[in-house]
A protein has these predicted regions:
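Active-site-adjacent structural elements that line small-molecule/cofactor binding pockets in enzymes
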Residues: 1-136
Length: 136
């Protein structure tokens, strides 16, 4: 039965109390979307988002060795489809809004980076995990 399955979604979570705090995670997410989006199999996703030609543009920059240029192709409009952004006080609501009824678990794609740099940062996620566990 499907009751025994969990759907675990790694998510690009852009979280911080200020825009400056969030900017780093936003740019990491932008680069990841550019990297994944350069794969031809992902072209249809950009087409569905009304951004045809994005994969071709990414591949062109990639072949030229312009990795930084790849990120510039991922506009804020494109990026918002792939990220959940908020403050520490609002990110749980953003996660719930996006994944309620779809995922049984959501994993912060950048969690290992944050933990490696500052093991204490994990404590900030406990109230978020609790809020999500208590969500309907």
């Amino acid at each position: 039965h499907l009751d025994h399955f969990e759907i675990i979604v790694p998510a690009f979570l852009v979280v911080g109390d200020t825009d400056t705090d969030r900017a780093r995670w936003r740019e990491l997410a932008r680069m990841q979307v550019a990297f994944y989006g350069s794969t031809p199999n992902y072209a249809f996703i950009f087409e569905q988002l009304d951004h045809p030609g994005t994969t071709a543009a990414l591949r062109e920059r990639q072949k030229a060795g312009d990795i930084a240029g790849m990120a510039t192709i991922i506009t804020d409009d494109i990026l918002r489809h792939f990220t959940i952004e908020g403050t520490w006080a609002t990110i749980a609501d953003g996660i719930a809004d996006r994944y309620a009824g779809l995922a049984t678990r959501v994993v912060n794609y950048f969690g290992a980076i944050a933990w490696t740099e500052d093991p204490q940062s994990l404590a900030r996620w406990k109230p978020i995990a609790t809020a999500l566990a208590d969500a309907p």
